[in-house]
């Protein structure tokens, strides 16, 4: 159990997890509602702060049950176990490359070889804000062609339009501006470094400009391990 407010602040009120998928418990009139944790990063950060951990570089992993209701993703149950790698105290892009290499090695050691690694780079919050304004202008030109779900996301969480499963929408978004083409100098440098380091580590990947992830705290590197079946 965690305070519901923890996830509202960190994940964002308009995310699917907060708006549709959390199991919440009304624990009394004081408004201190609890929920079954839907993910682990916010909980890890809470534990780091509450326990006043002083290490400037804190690397941890965890494994445990998470809970989501309302049409969970394909292949995921309402209670599922999640493995987490967290690094607190460093903004080096090499940490992202290391996490990807570790996960790639983990799957290999498990004998799982049929997957593809998709990566993208979201830049800083300021760069994303500028990009979303450009994306919004583009969507205005095709607003009569996109689905109802994308119309809602356009106003509430615009980058989530790229998660749409509608084939017509996906085809239209092929012409949308790419966030990696709208990065600042430092972010562009980090994006290049990430790809170079993955190449050096022999991690095979595909750049997917539509990969954005669904939580508000995401910035810079985003990735998914995708199964063909």
Give, region by region, the residue ranges found by the protein language model:
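TRNA-recognition modules of translation machinery and tRNA-sensing kinases, especially anticodon-binding
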Residues: 1-229
